[in-house]
């Protein structure tokens, strides 16, 4: 059985991946792979408590900045 907190985090991570995909015209797999490669997913996991309180556009912007600092070009 999945705990509610875990389910909430998973749903938030999926939503962020999809919002990032939409912002950069990617499909879900491309978005996840990019975020994983350039440490955006690590950022979401590490900073979930703060990050889930901001809007999705702000979260996408934060992810873009993190990924750029780690070699991403979007």
Pin down the residues of each PLM region.
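N-terminal acidic leader/helix
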Residues: 1-28
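Amphipathic, hydrophobic secondary-structure cores in small proteins
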Residues: 21-23, 27-52
């Amino acid at each position: 059985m999945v705990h509610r907190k875990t389910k909430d985090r998973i749903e938030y991570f999926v939503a962020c991946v999809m919002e990032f995909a939409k912002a950069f015209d990617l499909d879900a797999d491309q978005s996840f792979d990019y975020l994983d490669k350039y440490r955006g997913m690590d950022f979401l996991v590490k900073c979930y408590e703060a990050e889930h309180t901001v809007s999705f556009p702000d979260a996408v912007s934060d992810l873009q900045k993190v990924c750029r600092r780690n070699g991403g070009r979007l």
